[in-house]
Each structure stands twice: as structure tokens, then as C-alpha cells.
């Protein structure tokens, strides 16, 4: 990307990075949620660090987080009582939109996918 003069890196994160708790999973016997949330929090921090390092190369580094649960086979197996979910296609569309933003104006951010689709996130400059 440096040789190409720019680009976009999008890390996929989760609301679990910011909101501890059981989430949609009724059975915590596996003990995976603290590790999952902790790894997503670390990924958001890494996103900010790499964005800082690559800003001069016009490479945007952002994290995309589901604004609402994405109905995947795993979630549908473990989760209960979700009335409002997002489709994987909707999330993918948000990733494409985020990849097209100006790297000088949106980088180092964790953005919910609905904010990308409705344009409600605010670009900013590094100046």
C-alpha cells in the first residue's frame, strides 16, 4: 500500500470490546467472552497505533464494529431473543463504503456499521 500511494485497512471489532457482560450467550461455561472482548479492545488500540504510523502514507486504518448483532450461524445457535439483527451483506456493504473514504480524513476510528451506511460518522483531519 505504501508503494501504491495509499489504501485502507479495516479491522473487524465488536461492541464486546467496550461492554463487558454475558452478551447474547446464555452459557458462559466455555469462558471465552473475556478473552473475546479483550482481544477486540486490543484490536481497537492497534487500529489507532497503526493509523498513526501509516497516516503519512495516506493509508487509512479503521475498525468496523457491528451496530447491531449480525445473524451468523454461530450467533443463531447461541443467541436468544434477538429481534433486530443485521445481515452479513449489510455489514459487508459498510466495509466497502469505509474502504472508499479519504484516508486523510477518517483514520484511527472505530465506527459502527450503521454510521457508515447512513453517513452519520464525522470525518476529521489529522492536522
Question: Each PLM stretch: what is its role?
Answer:
Residues 4-5, 39-40, 84-87:
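Short alpha-helix in the Rossmann-fold core of NAD(P)-dependent oxidoreductases
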Residues 4-7, 101:
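Residue-level signal for short amphipathic helical patches enriched in basic/charged
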Residues 8-42, 47-56, 68-70:
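Catalytic loop of short-chain dehydrogenase/reductase
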Residues 21-24, 73-77, 120-125:
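Short aromatic-enriched loop/helix-cap "lid" or pocket-rim segments at secondary-structure transitions
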Residues 28-33, 73-90:
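Catalytic Tyr-x(3-8)-Lys segment
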Residues 56, 63, 80-127:
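C-terminal helical subdomain
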Residues 59-79:
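Flexible, glycine-rich beta-alpha linker
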